[in-house]
Amino acid sequence: ARELDIEKTFECGQCFRWNADENGVYRGTAFGYPAQVWTEDGEVYLCSDAPEKMWREYFDLDRDYAGISAGFHGGEYLDSCIAYGQGIRILRQEPWEALCSFIISQCNNISRIKGIVERLCESFGEPVEFEGAVYYAFPSAQRIAALEPGALDVLRCGYRAPYIMSAAQAVADGSLDLEA
């Protein structure tokens, strides 16, 4: 994949479900599909049961980021920012997961956000087995909205729990359209 640095993309703070093992293989899920992603000799490899089209869209691979950044001219500082961000792709994440992760991220650090999101998925997401490991899909808004009050306490997300529940209820009842 051109212009894709998986470490920069997964570690820049835009997503919280990808974790690298000791060999640099990232394991995670997107749209309920588990995957393993790694770089070897400058090439990115992906192992998943999901259709290639889904991953192309998820990693936004059909967008020419080099062409976009070539259009910016702002001096030395902007050039250094563009160079630093080279290889980062804007992930086309599932809207509900992105919203929920955003709520969790308020006044939080990446390590804690990852922990809360992981507990959310393990507690309320559907298990999916892949390559001998169990992954958890991100729970749907409908699943979260149907929970009893206090059920999110297990996440240890503090004051964010009612906001997660409120957002889930709005998505589930259609008053918040994430595709609008």
Name each model feature, range by range.
Residues 1-180:
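HhH-family (HhH-GPD) DNA N-glycosylase catalytic core used in base-excision repair
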